[in-house]
Structure formats: C-alpha cells, structure tokens
Amino acid sequence: MEVDSILGSLSITDDFDQLVDVTSLFDELCSKLKPEAIVKDPRFDLFEGTHSLEVNNSKLDSSLIELTAEEIEFDVNVAYDPPLASVAAIADRLLRCVISWLNDYQTLPTTVLSCRYTESLLSSLVKGTTAGSSWCTGNILYDKVLGSCILGVCYLTKFVQKLLSAGIVFEEEDLNFNNMGFNTFDNLPGQDVVINSLTESLQILEAYSDDSLHLTMLKHILKIIICLVHLEDHLTDYSTKTSHLDELIENANSVNGIFPQLQLSPPKGAFSTYIQKHRSNQFPPRKITKLPTDYSGFITLANDVKTILLVDKAESALETYQFAKFFNKLEQRHVIARILFPLFFIRDDRTVLGKFSYTQFYLLHVKEFSAQTPSEFESSIGNELIQESSNMLLEWYQNCSQNTCRYRQGFNRQLILWDSLQAQFESVNSQVYCSWTYFMKLSSMIEFSLKGFDLDIYKPFEAYSMFWYVYYLSHHLETFLKDSQNDIESNINAIHSMNKKLKKLKAGEKKDQLRLKYRFAMDNEMEQLQATKQFLNYLLKEINITKSLCLIEVFQFAILKSFGLIDNKNSTPSKFSNERLIHNLRFKPFNSIGVPELPEYEVFQQTLKDFVIEEKGAAFDIKLERATNFIETEVRNVVSSIDEIMQGIKGGDNNGVLVTGTRLVQELSLEYYCKLKHTSKALSVNSKVIVNTLKKNIKNKDSHEYKVELVHTTEGWNYFPIQTLRIKQDRYK
C-alpha cells in the first residue's frame, strides 16, 4: 500500500481518461528502425541533455559533506598527545594512503590529500614557502619529523604527477590525480633538500633514548620515504641502482613485523573529507578510502621497478623483445613500474637505453630476424619509411606496459599500421623489411584475438569463430616462418659449400679470394645465422602450440554442437541485428587487413559444418572417438613442445637447438609455459568430461539441461578457456 501511494503521487493527472495509450505507436515506429542506424532526433546534438549540474544532492554536491566537530576544529598548530605515538600514527596512515592511492587505484583526495597536514603544506606553498612545515607547535616531533614526512610524501606525489603527464597511462583508469586545485607541487624544494630534511629527522630520532616500538616504527617510515623520494633517480639519471629499492623492501618487511604489535591511532580529525568540502572540487564526494593493513604494497612497487630495470642488461634486440613481451604478461605490474618502463627504455635524448638511435634499434631487430646486415638493404629504402617503422616498433614496446585492457586496444590500433607498412615495403621490393613487418603484424593479430578471451569479451557462441580464425592466422605464420627458416638454411649451406669448394681448388689467386670470403662469412655471418635459425625454431614451436590449442578448442566446440548444446549463432533473437552483422562487427578490426585476407562469413559457417559430426548411431560414435583421440594426440604434442621450450629456457639457450631470448625474464617465461601446459592438460580432461557426460545424458534425453560457459582454470593460461558444461538454472526460481 505504501508503494502504491508513492507511485500514485507521481501521476501526471488523476483523470486517466485524458491519457493516450501510445504503445502501439511506439511498437510501429520501432519496427521501422534499421539495425545499423543510430536513434537520434535530428533537432538535438547526440549528447545534448546528458550533462547537468546537481545541487543540493548529497551524493553529488560536495558542499553538503557533513564534518564532525573534531574534523572542523582540527588544528595543525597543536601538538596532540602523546607526541611520539601520534606522529608515528599520522606518518603511518599517510604511507598507507600512498599505498592505497598507487596500488589500489584510489583517488588522491580520499588518500594522500585527506591528511590535514598535507593540505596545510600545499596551501602554504601558494604563499611562497618552499621548504619546511607550515605549522608551528613548539614540538620538534611535529614541526620537524612529521614535517619532513609530509614533505617527502608531497615530493613523491609531485614525481607521480610528472610520470602521469608523460601520457604513458590513462588518468582515472590507471592513476587518479585530482589535485583539488593545488597547482603548487612545482614550488616544492629539490630532491637534495627533501632528503636532507628526512635525514635530519632520522638523526633527531637516533638521539632519543626511548626504545619503544613507536620510535622504531617512525625510523622505518622515514627510511621508506627516503627510498620513495629516490624513485625519481630512475628517470632523471636513468639510474639502474637498486640499493634504495632493496632498502624499501627491507624496511617494509620490518614494519610488517612491528605493525601487529602496535595500536596506532592518529589524532581525531587529522584525516577527513575536509579538503573535498573546502577546496576546488569538481567531483562527487567520496568517503575516505579503507586502507591496507600492512606495507606489502611498497614491496610490490619495489620488486616491479627492479624487474623493469633488468631491461638495461639486454644484449640483443631479441632480449629486449622478449623482455617487453613477458614482463607485464602474467600479471599487471605496478602502475609506477609500467610508466617507468617506456620512459627508461625510450629516452629523452631520442635513444633506446642510451645505446641506440631509434633507427639503429629498429635495424637491429630486422638484422636479428633475417640474419642480414642492414647495410646490405638499407640504401634502397627511404629514410621516412625507416623512421615510420622505427616509431611503430617503439609504440609496440610502449603498448606492452599498458594495463590489461588498454594493451588489447593498443594492438587494435597497430594492426592497420603494420599492414600499411608492409604494403609500403612491398612497393619498394624490400623483402627483408617486409618479412619482419609481416611477422610483427601476424603476431599482433594473434595476440589481439586471444587477449579477448582473457578479458571475457567473447560469448561462448563466438568461441568457434575466434579460435578458428587464430588457427587460420597461425597457419599463415607457420608457413612464413618455415620459408624464413629455409632461407637461413640455404645461407648456412652456401657458406659450408665454400669450404668444400676450397678443398677442391688448386692454390692460386682464385682460391685465396674464396678463402678470404669464407673466413669473412664464418667470422661475421655464421654466428648470427645460427642464432636466427635457432630463434626461428623456437618461434615455430611456439606458433605450433598456439595452432594446436586453437584446433583443440575448435574440435571441442564442434563436439558440443554435434550434441546440440551450442551453435556459432547467438541464441537470443533480436529485431535489431542478425548473425552476419554480429560476425562482421566482431571481425571489423581485421576487415581492412590486406594479407592474410579475412575469410568471408560463409567460410566460417562451412568450416564449422565440416567439423561437426552429422552421422547418426554407430557412425556418430566412431567419428566422436576419432575426434577425442585427435585431441589427445594434439595435447601430447603440445606438452612435448612446451617441455622442449622450457628445457631451452632453463639451459640458458645453450642447447644448440633453440634460442628463446628469455635470459632476463627466465622465471616469468617458465611460469607462462607452465600455465600453458596446465591449460593443455585441462583441455584434454575437459574433452573426456564432455563426451562422457553427454553420452550418458543423451540416453536419458537430458542433454538439453546443460549450457556451455567459458571458464578460466585457476593455474592455466586465460587465452584458452575451458568450454565447460553447466547445468541450466531456472532464472525465475
């Protein structure tokens, strides 16, 4: 009754006879809509009316934030008792705010800027103060020690702002920097002044005879802040020193050991939403963030930064390529590490790692892939095209550090650019450049497609089309790699044939010239040819693994379709779309790619029909058994190939068969292949479960009770989800 009365109060009029039923008119207009048309009245802009200013709405109007008496009356010029415990509690909470901001993707106003001391310091910078605390309590712990802590955290915040301004990651998506109108970070003193202030505070604490845990905690906090201030060195000096990162880990672990023994409680009002109410705030009000209970976030930060610094030890383009491919692949790295990687790698002096120009770095990739010296083919190519290719390569490297969603989006943009570059190289008859570009394009197309499964972009009914398409791409890449391998073999054999020819020639000028040519080839070409050959062996094994896993997924989909559980069409009917439109939309990123050409919609349909078992009775069982046996064979081959690759990685690429280039990311690459092996075995088990379950239930006519879901195994690789049977649930129960 109460609901009825509320709804009744919303009525336009009490005289319902005056109202007109427009349902039939609405249905009629809807039936005339074209699926591909955007519904918009031509008299209005597309987004007109979607923006509004909300006043007197407590959820949107920050001026309505209610503060407690303690929060309103809090005074930074008061030394709250007990001083040591209070200062330790404030500094501790501030550092955990930093962790929440940087590790948990929280906003600046609900973390670092929620501290009244931070606000006070930043406000004082407006007035021209460039160092020291802006408060005066008469207590050295508050005025000096806490002041240096706040100064250090503000300096770190300034460094993060600098990183964000580089445009590597996306604000609000990777990192929030709502500075509440504070444009004063540039007024902060330099790094030396900040570190000196923190060091002096440490000396003050060392003079204390108190051996309490609060004092120990505060010392560790100061050391942690010093380490955080030193993060800037990796960008300003391109430092590869990790001593401060090791100290950060050590002190964070020490704090984690002390933390449970302390009850830290900052003075009431020291952290609040005060700044959101009183400063320039263009965002809806938010509650203070729930903070982490330890300093593990700093350990993650330090370890991830240490990881990206390893790229400086790369000895070849292959090693930098594999490093970029793996360092952010298994899990998303800390946002600071992800920003630092491209800035450390691609430097302001327009060099890569301070060693190569952009063009040199690009040519190094082409050389190591083709085993040909750049001077042999560079002269015929225009500088503009080389520069464009160099920029494209560097963009690929930068994309590797993006968050997991933007990573796929970056490939989407790059596909058409790789294709365009390939076409331009073909027009000037540069096979070597063209081949490497084709390899990068196909690899990116495969990565882009499979990443969609990791992000749960595809519905179960789309699994067949996507896996078959990746199988199709893998086949093209496999063929290309075999051709490249044959070219390398021919070059190696040509050098060996010189030696045989030398033995047959009589002494003389002709033999001397051939001997010089042979020695030059052995000294300058053979090593690179052998390395390239072994790298191509690795790439062939890797693409065969991808190809086989996709084929297994295709077979499992076909088995499920053979039992009538799934189709490559959406089971939900729609007036505004059809199967061809949905298919074309899914494959739109590949539609403009010239080579390999995107198969027509009918080809996808026909290939699925070829995989599906249409026979009945005993013939059905025979074909089903063949399919499951094929899956078992493919899984064994995949596991065998993975084991060979892992042995090569563990052996440091010294087995004379495979070169993987994973020296700098050995543990990460081994973990990746372990996940891939686990997925392979899970797919094998799943095929048996599918067949046994459906064969048993089809006799009882219960197969219609199942649906198919794409499930990621806990220890597996998400690019290849398991097509799992689930019992249908009545959604209305």
From Swiss-Prot:
The keyword Nuclease does not apply. GO terms for cellular component: cytoplasm; cytosol; NatC complex. InterPro entries: Naa35/Mak10 (IPR007244). Component of the N-terminal acetyltransferase C (NatC) complex, which is composed of MAK3, MAK10 and MAK31. It is found in: Cytoplasm. GO terms for biological process: macroautophagy. The keyword Zinc-finger does not apply. Belongs to the MAK10 family. Pfam families: Mak10. Keywords: Cytoplasm. Present with 1970 molecules/cell in log phase SD medium. The gene is MAK10. This is N-alpha-acetyltransferase 35, NatC auxiliary subunit. It comes from the Eukaryota. It comes from Saccharomyces cerevisiae (strain ATCC 204508 / S288c) (Baker's yeast).
